[in-house]
Amino acid sequence: MAPKRKQPYTEEGIDFKFTQFQIVPPINQKNFYTEYLKRDDQMYIWRDSAGEKDAKETESESANGDTKQDDSKKSQVEEEEDGIEESELGEEKDNKTIVLHIGSQNLRIGLASNKTPTTVPMVIARKMRAPFAQERCLLKDICHVNEDGNVAFDSEFDSNLKLLDSELKSWLKAQKKRSVPNGTQLVKNYNKISKPETVPPDDDPEKPDWIHFEQDDHVDVICGKEAFLLPLNEYPEYKLFYPIKSGVFNESDYASSQQLLADIYEIFKYSITSLLQIPVSQLSQYSVIFIVPDLYDRVYVEKILDILFFDLHFGKAAIVQESLCTSFGAGMSAACVVDMGAQKTSISCVEEGVVVPNSRIKINYGGDDITLLFMKLLMRSHFPYQDIDLKTPYDWSLANALKIKYCGLSEATYNVQLNSFFSRTPDKGTRKFTFKSLDETMLAPLGFFRPDIFENENKLHDRYTLFPVPVDVYDNQPNNPESLAQTTLLQISTPISNIKANGKDDEEKKEESDLVTPSVKFKPPRVVYCGSLAAPEIKNEKLIYPLDDAINQSIFSACDGNLSDEKAKNLYSSILIVGGAGQFPGFAHLLEERIHSKRANIPTISVIPPPRSMDAQFVAWKGACIYNRIRIVSELWIKNSDWKMLGSRVLQYKTLGYFWTG
């Protein structure tokens, strides 16, 4: 018989629980609710900002010894803080804020307290391991003499030039301007016999101070304007790199993404330390305002912010859209902003301090295309400087200077004109040329309205070869910002053979494109109805479209197709032209006429120049300085610690108007 089991000894009157954990009852799914991360004040970035604000208020109260402030006085102080900050605090803040505006050709950088920014060319000269043959672009090598004895380029260029020439003649006829008899032949005959005149070095006050190194004293990197003063024929081991192209990374000239980002870092560092005289060790005490394009590239913005935070160690940063800064700089609350840069043109409508998302358009042409077109037109007239090489920085600067000095759209200048210029090269010294021109100075700016004449084949052809396409983490689809106006123009201006089909390799697409041979050139309608349009999956994002039609499409999309609305009238009466590419004499008047001819039902169409006291290229930069004074910007600063912890996720909460998507 088994022994009896002993009972555990329990002391009467002692009631201990076996555990201290509370038993959680089952959740009633019918009444389940939570507020976790459903309010902005629960986010880390907002809780962190609120904690800093409370700490400052506590410190201020303890310093003043006035802990009990009445409600009326407190509300009065809050109302005063809603406007512009006091002058003393604002000036101190401006002295610690750097405004950064990156362009395809130049970098505008400076303290928010400065009147004008410092302009730094976005170029860097790097010493390569071995000498290499410099690229050349001689226009005389790509043109030929036809049967009539005239200089001509390819057939497509000549056909587009005939259309451009007929359009100019019809416009001059409407202005009751007579053509010059035998003017073209007079220009060619003079240019054929024009010879350069050598200028002694002592007689040239603007002689460039070319860089010459001592033996074994070469530097690895030269940034900014100094890179243009390097004689590449004497130092073939150096190569010029342009890290930004058409407002995005220039991936075609680089072998790796690290090299491209390193060049941008070197240009930033040179601009801040050498030109602004601010050591890198003190940048943690500074803030930076980064002006981003309206139709920005996510990878571009994120990589630039990585450089600002991780490499330069800025304390805080804020990003703001380009058109919004332009409206601030011009003092306009509503406008259609047309920013005409060196390699791209941006169009956006701003209303009440917010960029209308569906109105944003980016066109891939700019002032550089006008420069190249102008030089081609001069070569057709036997330009005396036949050896001009547009790949060298000094000859390209010369061509750009000729465009700025002589091009215009004023009918009063339509005549045979005698012009002169100085060519300064390191190998041939200074030479003076004289030449005559007739309609070349007017035909070149007209290219904005017939952009098919530009060289558009190789634009953005190496896009996304070094950096990945930004995609959404959930559906793995591209998530760069989209605009209905941009999508519309891409659909109606892209030939069917350029549309990329899913699941087809390059050989299959090539075979299909060989089968498609359109007999008639496709001419799309100028404006289409703004309905629900899905963006086509195209090979690249290149958009070439007439400027006046693009402006009409932008305003059309901003008003949801209702041109009779008061909003459309306000936008058409305030078309703001900024940037360096659209400041030709008479250009604004011609643009106004062309828009009015297609929008006759709009009573007032006005193309507004920038303020008189401000350079058209500095309006956006100056607007960012004004943005720095607005009280709300204190809530939009991204701290270095925020970026290190959250990365790009912080941008959707820290942008004015919440324009960052994803």
UniProtKB/Swiss-Prot annotation:
Q: Where is the composition biased (Basic and acidic residues)?
A: 50-59, 67-77
Renumbered to this chain, region (Disordered) spans 50-92
Under InterPro entries, the record lists: Actin, ATPase_NBD
Q: Which residues bind ATP?
A: D339, M340, G341, A342
Q: What's a BP term from Gene Ontology annotated to this protein?
A: DNA repair-dependent chromatin remodeling
> SMART domains, per this entry?
ACTIN
Task: Specify whether Ribonucleoprotein is a keyword of the entry.
Answer: no
Q: Does the keyword Nucleus apply?
A: yes
Disulphide connectivity of cysteines: none
Q: Which UniProt keywords apply?
A: ATP-binding, Nucleotide-binding, Nucleus, Transcription, Transcription regulation
Where does it primarily localize? nucleus
Task: Give the UniProt subcellular location, in the record's own words.
Answer: Nucleus
Q: Which GO terms describe its cellular component?
A: cytosol; Ino80 complex; nucleus
**Which GO molecular function entries does the Swiss-Prot or TrEMBL record give?**
ATP binding
Bias regions of kind Acidic residues — which residues? 78-89
Q: Which family does it belong to?
A: Belongs to the actin family.
Say what the protein does.
Answer: Probably involved in transcription regulation via its interaction with the INO80 complex, a chromatin remodeling complex. Exhibits low basal ATPase activity, and unable to polymerize. Strongly prefer nucleosomes and H3-H4 tetramers over H2A-H2B dimers, suggesting it may act as a nucleosome recognition module within the complex.
How is the subunit organization of this protein annotated in UniProt? Component of the chromatin remodeling Ino80 complex. Exists as monomers and dimers, but the dimer is most probably the biologically relevant form required for stable interactions with histones that exploits the twofold symmetry of the nucleosome core.
Q: What is this protein called?
A: Probable actin-related protein 8
Please name the source species: Schizosaccharomyces pombe (strain 972 / ATCC 24843) (Fission yeast)
